[in-house]
Amino acid sequence: MAKAVNLPIILYNIPARTGNKLLPETVQALCRDVENIVGAKDSSGDIENLKAYIRLTRELDKEVAILAGNDGAILTCLKEGGAGGIAGRANIWPETVAKIYDCFKAGDLEGAQAAQDAIAILQQTFK
């Protein structure tokens, strides 16, 4: 399908909804072999899987955006070299979620961690 369109494609790993896991090696191969696949969002909840996406796509001859799909993994994704996250809770707390990215990019790791921690606290209010 990706080869049939002239649009950038981001792969989406959400095994809880699909029943299938998009393996890191598969993400690497698809990003390598299909020009317009430009990234992947990992909502598996498996930090090691997210890290493997980042590590394996870093080996490619093109820039690939790896995004955390779990709100609690945004800062980890950034620290590992990923592009950030697409967070569901950003719809409710956009400033707090954006602050994780903004602080990280500014070199303020304490501020980024505080914002990441705030998301975890806010999440607890909805359980």
Each predicted region: which residue ranges?
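Catalytic alpha/beta core domains of metabolic enzymes, predominantly
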Residues: 2-7, 17-127
